[in-house]
Amino acid sequence: MARFLVALLAATLVAVQAGGQLGHAAPATGEVFWRAVLPHSPLPDAVLRLLKQPAAESTSFVRDPEDRPPFDYRDYSRSSSDDEPSKSTVAASGAGGFDYDNYSGADERRGATDEYKAPSSSLAGSGAYMARGGKAETTTVFFHEEAVRVGRRLPFHFPPATPAALGFLPRQVADSVPFTTAALPGILATFGIASDSTTVPSMEATLRACESPTIAGESKFCATSLEALVERAMGVLGTRDIRPVTSTLPRAGAPLQTYTVVAVQPVEGGPVFVACHDEAYPYTVYRCHTTGPSRAYTVDMEGARGADAVTIAAVCHTDTSLWNPEHVSFKLLGTKPGGTPVCHLMPYGHIIWAKNVKRSPA
């Protein structure tokens, strides 16, 4: 079995390399699937990149912890003791040292040198910021819903995109590879990863996150192929008529600067969405969960430098009553469980799935 998997993976790597060398190669199977089941939804740039990732970009299974925002907003339930500042804690593409889609735990990193700041009156009092490593620079972590208004200003740092080394595996390959913590030794052998590699802790963390129980009222799944990602999102939302909403950000990232909101568009199809976050793994794995009662937006912003314009997808959680009272968002925003909505952006490559809303003819 192991030899069979190795052969499949080798074939996949050859295909990835060929795709990177041939500008007009045939579309990947996942791309064909997407166009068939989501004909009215163009492939987001980040997803297309995962399907046609040049081999030259895939130099390591390990993501650089320095190229991450300060928090990982995917888990509102983990205890602060679960979050370590070490380089072995490698989070998803653009995610950081905290899991902030975890609903039942405090999020404080032991030994961190980051300084947390309350909302600033100079920036309309709408966001919570943090200075990294003792530096004076600050970047938005969480923000109040009132920040999602034209004219509001927020500082953001967008790190470079760091997709999984192998991108999306073909479905038949992904389905053939075990995906459990119990099978981790065999998984490492399949990928030729040493047991003492710095990749291992992040892989194990991803597997454990996918196996962890959900809170009341939440649906969660992990998808190891593009086909599984789309089909599972359809199943959770109860319809095949769905669409993806993503942030439009530069792949190379953008330096910290103050952005001004110039346009806001609510995302229809709520109040429950499916949020998907790519996890640290040799190939692309998305961990997805229902957001609970939420409002979602696409927000157009212009940077202080003039030329830097971005569009972020943002989620505002309107019911935080089940979140841990010690969650860092409450500390930064000065609120509490069941209080005002808590908002955060979706980094590059992360996806909000929403039901398509059909309007009646006027």
Swiss-Prot record:
PROSITE patterns: BURP (PS51277)
Glycosylation site residues: N102
Keyword Signal listed: yes
Pfam families from the UniProt entry: BURP (PF03181)
Signal sequence annotation: 1-20
Function field: Required for pollen development. Probably synthesized in the tapetum, packaged in Ubisch bodies and transported at appropriate stages to the micropsores.
Protein's recorded name: Protein RAFTIN 1B
Origin species: Triticum aestivum (Wheat)
Gene that produces this protein: RAFTIN1B
